[in-house]
Amino acid sequence: MNEFKPLLGKVATGASLTRDEAAYVFDKMMSGEATPSQMGALLMGLRVRGETVEEIAGAVSVMRSKMLSVEAPSEAVDVVGTGGDASGSYNISTCASFIVAGAGVPVAKHGNRALSSKSGAADVLAALGVRIDLDPAGISRCIAEAGIGFMFAPSHHPAMKHVGPTRVEMGTRTIFNLLGPLSNPAGVTRQMVGVFAKSWIVPLAEVLRTLGSQKAFVVHGSDGLDEITISGGTDIAVLDEGRIHTFTIMPEDVGLKRHPAEDLKGGDAVHNAKALRTVLDGAEGAYRDVSLFNAAAALVVAGRAKDLKEGVEMARVSLDTGSARARLEHLVAVSEKLAPEAAQ
């Protein structure tokens, strides 16, 4: 820990850490070797100055090295958001994940309980009857048998227990809000990541490139959503075989209707679970359209659709044939069968 103080001093001057230096301090933090004061000072120093690509890459490399891994097919994708967008939206990425699975793409979904909203991915899945307490082998079985599996972040990142209390006491966004979506325990190299600010789409695409992702969309909606929105435009940074480019897309560009942002609002886990089921049952409206749009992006990232317009059509087929709904029912059944008490 004798190197922690000098590196903290470096951050205090406004200087950036190298990737190796960032890896060092985050290893100390996630090993329980840094004090709460040191952790709080470092996290706030990075936040105020602005975290760099190298710092995030160094921190993610440590988080990945300490996580409990899950085996998944190499073509598996994740659809995930950083949260922190204060939108209170319905669980868009979770619904989109079932649509993607229904289109034949394996999904390794990584998520947590609600942090800033009323219902996180773990909350709504539990309300739908999915067991979120499976071990890595059980999750791998879910992906193999149901086409989708859920990895509950706290179960796969035990080292985070060392920084959790400091994060709670700080009560503000830190670099850790960015690390979770970049630390999928299944090691997916194809992902759609939603972020809480437009300024982060290119830096996070650069981090994913540095860490070996094949293809990714990093997205931010003009209404503040950490998803692709249907109330206006969405800014997207695309990583594809080492190259990054950006574009802005509107719902009309892919044949979807525009809806006001308030129509995307959700409620608690029970409310959102009911809403998600209605979408999978074929209900029309804003929830369906925004889920189609986000699923389309994941299908492009997976290499199944050539563009977002084709992705929307593939997503429609997944919904309208009942395939997406079947993925949910299958996941509920398989996860229940593999639950800890069922194995006793």
Swiss-Prot record:
It comes from the Bacteria. Keywords: Amino-acid biosynthesis, Aromatic amino acid biosynthesis, Glycosyltransferase, Magnesium, Metal-binding, Transferase, Tryptophan biosynthesis. GO terms for biological process: L-tryptophan biosynthetic process. GO terms for molecular function: anthranilate phosphoribosyltransferase activity; magnesium ion binding. Pfam families: Glycos_trans_3N, Glycos_transf_3. Catalyzes the transfer of the phosphoribosyl group of 5-phosphorylribose-1-pyrophosphate (PRPP) to anthranilate to yield N-(5'-phosphoribosyl)-anthranilate (PRA). Homodimer. Belongs to the anthranilate phosphoribosyltransferase family. This is Anthranilate phosphoribosyltransferase. It comes from Xanthobacter autotrophicus (strain ATCC BAA-1158 / Py2). The gene is trpD.
